[in-house]
Every structure is written in C-alpha cells, then in structure tokens.
Amino acid sequence: MGNAATAKKGSEVESVKEFLAKAKEDFLKKWENPAPNNAGLEDFERKKTLGTGSFGRVMLVKHKATEQYYAMKILDKQKVVKLKQIEHTLNEKRILQAVNFPFLVRLEFSFKDNSNLYMVMEYVPGGEMFSHLRRIGRFSEPHARFYAAQIVLTFEYLHSLDLIYRDLKPENLLIDHQGYIQVTDFGFAKRVKGRTWTLCGTPEYLAPEIILSKGYNKAVDWWALGVLIYEMAAGYPPFFADQPIQIYEKIVSGKVRFPSHFSSDLKDLLRNLLQVDLTKRFGNLKNGVSDIKTHKWFATTDWIAIYQRKVEAPFIPKFRGSGDTSNFDDYEEEDIRVSITEKCGKEFCEF
C-alpha cells in the first residue's frame, strides 16, 4: 500500500472510532432512560399476519392517523412467562428503542395492555432473506459479500455498545426496498460486558462454546457470521442434520467441508470465522473487526459506501406499494384477545 492509501486507511479508522464513540453516547442516553410507551392498540388497523412464533405473532398494521404501514410484534405475556422469556423480552424492547443504525429495523412505537406486549417496527416489504435464498438456491459471492458487509458493520456497531446479537440467521434478515438488509428480532440480544451463559439461538448457527456450556462472548456472533456467509454462498448451512444433537456434534468437531465452487479467499475467511479455537477466531483477536474488514474476500468492499447505502444492491425485491405482503408467507389469522383483568403486571412493569 502506498503512503496515500495508508493515510486514507488511518483516517478511516479514526473516523470509525469517532462515529462509534458518538453512537455509544446516544445509545447510553436511551438505554438509561427508555422512551415511554407512545401508542395503543386502537391506533392501528390490523391487516395481516406476517409471521408467528412460540409466544406471539407479527402483523402488518396501518397507523390510522398517518396511514403508514408498520410491522407489529404482539407477545402474549402469559406465554412469555411460561417459556421463561421475561428477561429476553424486556431486553429486546430496551435495546431496540436505544439503537440506531442503517441496517437495524427501527422500533417506532411500543405499549402493553392486560394480555399482551406490543412492539411496532417499520415494515420491510421485501420479506426475509431466507425466502429469497431458498427461491434462488444460492447467492453469488459478490451478492453474499454485499449482505455480509452490512452484517459486519452492524456487529461492529452492536459490539461497541457491549451488545451481543445471538440470533443471526436468514429468517431474521429482511430485504428493504433498496435491496439492503434490515436486521430484525432482538429477542436474544443482550448487553454483556464480560461473558454470559444462556443457551439460546438456532441449532445450525450456535457457536461451539455455547453448545459446550462455556461462558461465551461477542465472538459467538462472528461464528454465526461464518455460518451465514457459508449458507448464502452454498445454499445450505455448513452443519446440518435431522436432529439438533447431530448438528451439535458436527459443530464442535471443528470440521467444515466447502463446495468446490467456493473461491479460495472465501474458504480462508470461513476457516477463520468457523474457528473452534477462540484465541484464533477472527473478530475476537487483538485487531478485532479489522481482521475481517481487511480480509482478501472483502478487498473490493467500500465499507463507507456500504454504510452510506451508496452501493447498488445486487437484487431489489418486487412489491407493489408500501402495504404489499406478497413477499411473506400466509398464516392463519387469529383475533387478538385482551383480558378484562391484568395478566403478569409485575413481571412486565418495566416494559
């Protein structure tokens, strides 16, 4: 690298440092003083279910006053308690209302009633990366790299705030109208300065240290990035089997096989991300994220341009109008039932 290039790199590193310092200040203000609830169920017209989970659903809604479309996540308090997800749910809201990054879905409103908790997010009509990946089969390396770069920047941002994401997978990545990623579902995100021990995540994406019940840190997100890049470029994840236990055996074995079409740079990056030895895993070494950002596979990536959303996306999802749901699957519709008496008031008093 010439002197000019070295100087440019140096000033970029400095401006990233400044950016993250300011971002932390903004985050901490909101983290320490979370925004009060600012809406109610009656403010929204419910349109269609976009997804369902073990303790709730996500619906497309229309805000009556502004006619804007949003995605409303509805969590049944009693089910959250039964599934021991109180802490996770409180984390999700507290984190979402405090973060601000181009590739994170925005929380616009939140509130609760006798039965449910509600989080109203911007609606991303392009649907999940998962459905596009399954339809296309696999993404070319440049296509996969475009998405991977956004996740790298997002993790750099989150980790600088001491946040671990813990739930990276194609189902949680929405493709917006410009073809960029919106990370959704902060149900497992957590603010951790040292290590944490909770077993959570999705089997195919779990890092070995989580499976082995060791204390773990932010490095689990970099492992998951390796799994995601592999799955985007191959069309299937690096470790898969019928039963979770068989998946776990493969993950901890430290053996990965690559399709013959993977470039040597891609294989090299993945060997460093899917590295069982934490003292060798990229993202977890003394240079931190820069080992990943300066890796040969990312040589053509203009990190600033990606952050500024100036790079042309490889794929723009098709949709007609802001309330179109054609990129989401159909689900059975169910009424939202609200009890006349308060449920689990104590558990969720801080929501």
UniProtKB/Swiss-Prot annotation:
Q: Where in the cell is it found?
A: Cytoplasm; Cell membrane; Membrane; Nucleus
Indicate where the modification Phosphothreonine is found in the sequence: 198
Q: Which residues bind ATP?
A: 50-58, 73
Instruction: Pinpoint the AGC-kinase C-terminal domain residues.
Output: 299-351
Attached lipid, kind N-myristoyl glycine, located at: 2
User: In the UniProt entry, which residues are flagged as the active site?
Assistant: 167
Q: Name one GO biological process term.
A: negative regulation of TORC1 signaling
Enzyme Commission (EC) number: 2.7.11.11
Q: Which GO terms describe its cellular component?
A: cAMP-dependent protein kinase complex; cytosol; nucleus; plasma membrane
| Job of this protein | Mediates cAMP-dependent signaling triggered by receptor binding to GPCRs. PKA activation regulates diverse cellular processes such as cell proliferation, the cell cycle, differentiation and regulation of microtubule dynamics, chromatin condensation and decondensation, nuclear envelope disassembly and reassembly, as well as regulation of intracellular transport mechanisms and ion flux. Regulates the abundance of compartmentalized pools of its regulatory subunits through phosphorylation of PJA2 which binds and ubiquitinates these subunits, leading to their subsequent proteolysis.
Task: Report quaternary structure and partners.
Answer: A number of inactive tetrameric holoenzymes are produced by the combination of homo- or heterodimers of the different regulatory subunits associated with two catalytic subunits. cAMP causes the dissociation of the inactive holoenzyme into a dimer of regulatory subunits bound to four cAMP and two free monomeric catalytic subunits. Interacts with PRKAR1A and PRKAR2B. The cAMP-dependent protein kinase catalytic subunit binds PJA2. Interacts with GPKOW.
Protein name (database record):
cAMP-dependent protein kinase catalytic subunit beta
Give the originating organism. Sus scrofa (Pig)
